[in-house]
Amino acid sequence: MQPDLTLLGKLRSTWASATVNVIHPISLCLSWFLGTIGCSSPLPLRCADLRILLLKKKEFCLLPLFYHLGIFQHLFYPIIPLLAFCFYAPRLVCPAASLEFQRRYVVWILAVSRHIVFLENSYYIMLLHPHHLHHPHPPFLIFLFLILRKLRRNRSVKAQRIMQRSCHRLLFAPVGNDSELSAPSAPSESVVPLRRFNRQSVSTV
């Protein structure tokens, strides 16, 4: 097969070489770094639902999303450092930023990530074309299984509800100082009757 000597062909070959030799290793290292550092350091947020959404829900989480984007084709590689910078910009550039700004910023990043998750699913569904089925690779088979399971359980609606609930709490929650972030949360309803029972037992004795 003769190489394409046109300008577009040269640009394609240069971009593919840079992707394989430079951008792909950087994206993998960046994914590992964000997955390690990001999970070990808590986010500057008070909403517990958002932490669960970011750190435990793998289908809708930002940190595994960097790894998912790492195995994309050449078009999606530049999104990884861009999202990493956008996600950590308030903490790196201005650590003393107001909580309201950080909350609205994270809500915007969550909205962007939701669209990219949609692009991710659309991309792997596009690979179902017969042209791509003659060389299925393990990541494709794994993500095909995850997408089919997600569509079967209808998790997209659930994810949208979780996202709307978390964004609503972030946007309309009262803004406090940093000491409120480390303050213990209010006791749940299941704990209150137990404390009342203990008080009554002590008073009777």
From Swiss-Prot:
Protein name as catalogued: Uncharacterized mitochondrial protein AtMg01260
Its membrane topology: Multi-pass membrane protein
General remark: A stretch of 270 kb of the mitochondrial genome is duplicated within the centromere of chromosome 2 resulting in the duplication of the gene. The expression of the duplicated gene is not demonstrated.
Subcellular location: Mitochondrion membrane
GO cellular component, one term: mitochondrial membrane
Sorted UniProt keywords: Membrane, Mitochondrion, Transmembrane, Transmembrane helix
Transmembrane segment boundaries: 18-38, 69-89, 106-126, 127-147
Lineage: superkingdom: Eukaryota
